[in-house]
Amino acid sequence: ALMVIASTSYAQVYKMYKTRNYHNQLRLNTMTGEVQQIQDDGQSWEICSAREILGDKEGRFRLYETQNMWTFIMLDTYTGKNWQVQFSVKGEDYMFAAPINIFSLAYPEKSSNWTNRFQMFATENMWTFILLDSYNGRLWQVQYSTQDLDNLFCIPINKYELVENNERCIFSIQPLTSMYQYYLINDNTGDMWKFQWSTKGDDYRWIERFR
């Protein structure tokens, strides 16, 4: 029992992420959002400076791998802010962190101790992720780009809270046959919604109660 307690109470401040370039890994400070590129010859570079300088919650920041080997998406799981993080072997001019969403989608208090509130899910379109607020069911479509940094965006699919005053993960999503459609599920009540993301415009993004 003591071993179980020790393992469940441990949280990583620094987390290493493998890349598809076997000489390099990314090291994330999960409390502040600082990202460093670590090369196996001993060199290192700061790709992203701390986003929350006074951050004190382990696991607050996460990196998500994309289908582009040089690109990760960093997510602040407390606020929903996210950044496109680029590493490189060509030099520091090719390393950067570009903001995708700079607006807080939730407002944690000092006492907030949220776990995985905001989560991201890759779609079958390599440039598109789904952002979920697992506490209240809000949804956004997140778009990144390696060609045009003016084409980064985070737009709502469902901007309305489906439950109020909840502070734990109760919502999940499930892909359907169409790559554009998913179920949104309240795992507590079984309530379901069907939603669609799209690259064609707002008229093609929708959510409806399923049952």
Q: Where are the regions that the model predicts?
A:
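Sec/Tat signal peptide C-region and signal peptidase I cleavage site
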Residues: 5-11
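Trp- and S/T/G-rich repeat-edge/linker motifs of beta-rich repeat architectures
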Residues: 41-57, 89-114, 146-167, 198-211
